[in-house]
A protein has these predicted regions:
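TPR/TPR-like (Sel1-like) alpha-helical repeat modules
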Residues: 180, 184, 222-226, 231, ...
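Register position in tetratricopeptide repeats
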Residues: 54, 88, 157, 206, ...
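Alpha-helical adaptor scaffolds
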Residues: 245-257, 288-292, 318-372
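Amphipathic alpha-helical segments of tetratricopeptide repeats
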Residues: 70, 181, 188, 238-239, ...
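TPR alpha-solenoid repeat register
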Residues: 78, 147, 196, 247-248, ...
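"A position-specific structural signal for the A-helix of alpha-solenoid helical repeats
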Residues: 47, 81, 88, 150, ...
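Short coil/linker segments at helix-helix boundaries
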Residues: 28-48, 52-64, 74, 85-143, ...
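Short coil turns that delineate tetratricopeptide repeat
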Residues: 73-74, 142, 191, 242-243, ...
Length: 425
């Protein structure tokens, strides 16, 4: 597949969530890779590990997946799931485990933010082990759909890591495209292999979302897509898939949001938040979608009063900020929660309150450094929008005193020279 004609920024932005969390597995097939008894035991471990990971219990998930790797040494799921856990925990620790954080050009600029070499080495060890097991299987059984599905899943996992942790955009694009090719091969072997369609649907959507000129150029090279068809495919997987239903629903939150189908995004996020109560991320995604829906309604109806959607969103944030009985994973993410609350308030035009939440984010004990830098920047911009120039200048200077992340220093230097004005989209 030629990678040059696919807009790398758009492709990897979507690939971020492709397998995140990606502890789905190849759906049951006619493969005899595992005996019936082994598969029953394996399924128990898979379900337990998946539940732990969706609820952000990384240590619990890691323990289960290590047990899986030992119990089934010739099956790639154990090392693949261990790699998944490493990726998701790393993103949690750096506060990137939320789709809306990628919806900014800032993410694609250079920064001082570098991954831990030990993390990179461990991740590559796990994915290399998983891939070797898959390749060994394919040498014996070249048309094994389950092995090919694993192959594509591993390539997609590598793409997510390269994009979100290493920020190697073109490497992510290449591996993401390889994942699509492998899953297309799966469908050729088994047209009813529904889980493989998630990757294909995402690719279909991505090509369909390209600007017209690039879409035409991609078409000449044989790359065709449709946003409508891509979303429909992922919706079908969410309904009929075997082990990637939750992944597909998570992906739909992002795609619905990009298509301004905010109410539908909020509905899915609300359902997943109820199913996985210890996972605060779905609550944040729900609140994001509700705020965007409220802004859309306000623009359409020319009504300034808060809508029901906005009220629900703010109540969600207030609950996350002030609930004394929050799970530890949520308490440890208060920097992100305050940050997202600030974004919601800024969208609603409540700039003073937004600035306070951004400052609160930066001041959380143990706040992630990169997020704290961006929080100071966003506080400055909110203060500018609220007409408090002197306070804004203080926050811009705070940005420059901190490690650079994305293009924060560049934006802060611009902010010191001129009042920030909100971009109209």
């Amino acid at each position: 597949m030629n990678t040059r004609m696919v807009n790398p920024k758009k492709m990897v932005f979507l690939a971020v969530i492709l397998l995140l969390p990606s502890f789905a597995l190849a759906q049951p097939s006619n493969s005899n890779w595992l005996s019936q008894a082994d598969r029953a035991k394996f399924d128990q471990l898979r379900i337990s590990g998946s539940e732990a990971l969706y609820n952000l219990d990384y240590e619990g998930a890691r323990k289960i997946f290590k047990e899986m790797a030992i119990a089934f040494p010739n099956y790639p799921a154990g090392p693949q799931f261990l790699a998944d856990t490493l990726l998701i925990e790393a993103l949690y620790q750096t506060r990137r485990l939320q789709a809306s954080l990628y919806n900014s050009d800032s993410f694609y600029n250079t920064s001082d933010d570098k991954p831990d070499p030990k993390l990179v080495d461990q991740f590559r060890t796990y994915t290399r082990t998983a891939r070797q097991l898959v390749e060994s299987r394919l040498k014996q059984y070249p048309n094994d759909a389950e092995a090919l599905y694993f192959f594509g899943a591993i390539e997609g996992l590598k793409a997510s890591f390269e994009e979100t942790v290493e920020r190697r955009h073109f490497a992510a694009l290449k591996d993401g495209n390889d994942a699509v090719d492998k899953h297309r091969d799966v469908i050729k072997l088994d047209p009813n292999y529904r889980d493989a369609e998630m990757t294909i649907g995402l690719y279909d959507y991505t090509i369909g979302a390209l600007p017209l000129a690039k879409k035409i150029a991609a078409g000449f090279l044989g790359h065709r897509g449709s946003k409508k068809r891509g979303i429909a495919t992922i919706e079908r997987v969410a309904r009929e898939g075997n082990w990637v239903k939750e992944d597909s629903k998570t992906l739909l939150i992002l795609l619905y949001t990009r298509e301004k189908r905010f109410a539908e995004a909020a509905t899915i996020a609300r359902d997943l938040a109820a199913k996985y109560p210890r996972n605060y991320l779905y609550k944040l995604e729900m609140a994001d979608a509700l705020v965007a829906q409220a802004a859309l309604e306000r623009e359409s109806n020319h009504v300034a009063a808060p809508s029901a959607a906005e009220t629900e969103a703010f109540a969600t944030f207030e609950g996350l900020v002030h609930d004394k009985n929050l799970p530890e994973t949520t308490r440890k993410a208060l920097d992100l929660i305050h940050f997202k609350y600030g974004e919601a308030l800024r969208t609603a035009g409540l700039y003073d309150r937004a600035a306070k939440e951004f400052v609160a984010s930066a001041q959380v004990v143990g706040a992630q450094e990169g997020l704290a830098t961006m929080a100071h920047l966003y506080a400055a911009q909110a203060l500018d929008l609220g007409g408090k120039r002197n306070d804004a200048l203080t926050q811009y200077r705070a940005v420059l005193s901190r490690p650079n992340v994305y293009d924060a220093h560049e934006q802060a230097q611009t902010g010191l020279k001129e009042v920030y004005k909100r971009k109209m989209t």
